[in-house]
Amino acid sequence: MCIRDRIVAGGWYFYTSSEIQVSDNLTLGDAIQPGIPKATLILAGNNKQSLTPTYPTPVKVNHSTTAIAQNGALIYPTTPNTNIDSILKQRSEVIENNTLTTEQGNEFRVTFEDGTTVHLNYNTELRYPVKFSQTKRMVYLKGEAYFKVAQDTRPFYVITDHGTIRQYGTEFNVNTFSPERTEVALVKGSISIIPTKSSQEQFIKPGQLAHIEQKNNNISIHNVDLTPYIAWNEGRLIFENRTLENIVEILEHWYNVDISFGTSELKQLRFTGNMDRYATISPILKAIA
């Protein structure tokens, strides 16, 4: 059977951009591959470079710095904060920003000059200086990213549309996909959160999930099992009592497919599951079909 641009499975309709020969709908799921490590690096002057697993290793990120692109990650050369020669040199340089962006069906990693690592999920934008200042480390995030912040005397700030997260050395996930709130899951260490339109500052502890609400600038903190919120960073797709509508939204972004429902009633069905994020979409179809 030849199906073009539509796959039907359990009342779901999957749209792809190519024609695929299949014997049944679940077999077609084997042809839909997961996301890949790919990103666009935007340099000063809006110059853009595409980063893929096959991209040449050296990447000139400004006039004096060359990063290394390898295995789906961009790695900046380390600059020890205690090196006096480096400090004096930095004071005479203009701080330049780089921006790393991922699209639907993509992910990427970056290691900053201080040793901090960030894993960008799909549809994410991260803006940061090539070298941090001597007093603070500050980045700007839209989308979702998992941070492992290197220990340093300088505070590390993540700026989002809804608020600012501050820490010194810790591990956490930030999700800004919802226009209504920013979600922060703290794995290790301690962080504080300040809403954009407020001076209110709240600290959260490991194992807590915080929501920064756009409507009223309130911060709500919950003690939860963080596993479903950080599973994507560890190569899993974990859903706990999630609606099919919510699951479909995640699958669309990661597998780069468009999905619609045979009936609106299907959207509110709830599922719990634990899947390999790097497998084809077929196991998920079989689990919920």
Mark where each language-model region is.
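A residue-level detector for the "anchor" residue at the start of short, highly conserved motifs
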Residues: 9-289
